[in-house]
Amino acid sequence: GSAWALQHPQWMLDARGKAKQEDWTKDGEHDSYLFNLGNPEACRWMSKYIGDFLEENGIDYYRQDFNIEPEGFWAANDEPGRQGICEIRYIEGLYSFWEYLLNRFPGLLVDNCASGGRRIDLESISRSAPMWRTDYSYGEPIGYQCHTYGLNLYLPLHGTGTVSADKFTFRSSLGTSIIYNWKITEAGQSIYDMRDRQAEFKELRPYFYEDYYPLSGINNITSENIWLAYQLYRPSDDSGYIVAFRRKDNPDKSYTVNLSGLHPDHTYILTNKDTGEAIKKTGKELANGFTLTLDNPQSSLII
């Protein structure tokens, strides 16, 4: 009964009972449609409609989510012997839609969400950025560390949330974007800690746009008994950070890493952001091995 479904029924995909949307039924019948971006006429109309809306309202940040199961809509509309074509045409239309917006608004950010990180493919990320990268257990730090550790290898722009202002949890969510979900009115919460974490994020954020080096290998990175560490390096001014985590079951107070990208003959000052301790090392020394120290499990450091 929506306006678009009544005005343009030919642009709607009907799942004909095959979509996995049990809550979207009425009298036993499926009661929803999927707007068909695979229809060129529909795609052009939607592109202009959203583009006009952005222009009229001065919007420069466009976020698109997709919290339904589209497979049933696509499968129900495939022609015999043409399995997958409806999906292919739809995704081609989606890319065309985003390209229209980016061509019309060159400074636009397209924030791409699909049930959390389900569209982190090369074609999508060439047109958009997943500022909510996953619906994985919200605030669980080990998973978040692993997401950052892997995605940074090829995807500078991605983000997630944080529910706690403690250093270990917050630093697990570092990236180019963080959504703060702090309960500032709850007992025991510290506004000062929150402000410190925000300042730390703003300080490190620009470094995620340049060089990245994982420092602790790729084996068993989900385990609770390891150290996980990575390096952010900015060749533009020869500066950077080390971010490291000692997980709760790790027995070792120290861990040695080999830094990359540094000039062998340059001298670098390394300052522990938590203790203020500073030392000097050459790039060659840092490449040959630098030892990180954390006295307690479930702790972190930034240098």
Enumerate the predicted regions with their spans.
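Generic beta-strand/beta-sheet core signal
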Residues: G1, Q7, D14, Q64-N67, ...
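Active-site-adjacent "subsite" loops/lids of carbohydrate-active enzymes
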Residues: G1-D52, E56
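Histidine/acidic-residue-rich catalytic or RNA/ligand-binding cores of hydrolases
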Residues: S2-Q7, G72-N77, R119-A129
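Glycine-rich tight-turn/loop motif centered on a GG-T
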Residues: W11-A19, A76-Y90
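Alpha-helix capping and helix-loop boundary segments enriched in small/acidic/polar residues
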Residues: Y33-L37, E41, G81-E92
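Active-site groove signature of glycoside hydrolases
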Residues: W45-E79
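Active-site-proximal substrate-binding groove within the catalytic cores of carbohydrate-active enzymes
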Residues: E55, I68, L94-A278, Q298-L301
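C-terminal beta-strand-rich structural cap/linker in extracellular carbohydrate-active enzymes
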Residues: K281-I303
